[in-house]
């Protein structure tokens, strides 16, 4: 499969590419995070139709969550452009979302079948993006991730370590809980999913 990775210069993007190169089962093409800050739909159309692709792997928003740039309305509009063009061209879509779609107020562990219930601005934006993709695309696979970390920056763990090295004071919340995952493990799982898609498995799911 020929895969367009949005956010190829992110820690996750580097991990995806490092897994793909030795396996040589799929061709990875992609754009850096700065390039994905499109201002017009025609910029997205030019990217998608420049070369024939089978799958869009969208790592934009899950990367921004762990960075310093806010996720907001412009990202929803860009996702709309991507989804409509992918639907028109018959391109499958693999979207990396976040567990932040859940509020964390349940007293039991969340299940993927639970209805997203986040009320904070970030969580509500992520929910809106997921709903937009499901409403627009027939072949969309959504994978929700927890906090990611790795050796490459930017990521929350690296920022915390850098701050400690400078002697800065770090503020954290007692109420935020999760299961951090290394970007290499995410990349391994992603390649497994893509392999199954390439072998004929359904290209939609949550």
Regions found by a protein language model. Give the residues of each.
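NAD(P)H-binding glycine-rich loop region in Rossmannoid oxidoreductase-like domains
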Residues: 35-80, 85-87
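Conserved Rossmann-fold NAD(P)-dependent oxidoreductase catalytic core, especially the SDR/UDP-sugar
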Residues: 80-119
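A recurrent short beta-strand within the Rossmann-like NAD(P)-dependent oxidoreductase core
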Residues: 170-171, 175, 197-206
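A short beta-strand-loop structural module common to alpha/beta enzyme folds
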Residues: 26-38
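SDR active-site strand-loop-helix element
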Residues: 6, 31, 59, 93-99, ...
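Short-chain dehydrogenase/reductase
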Residues: 6, 72, 76, 108-130, ...
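N-terminal Rossmann NAD(P)H-binding glycine-rich loop of SDR-like oxidoreductase domains
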Residues: 1-24
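NAD(P)-dependent short-chain dehydrogenase/reductase
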Residues: 131-178, 185, 191-192
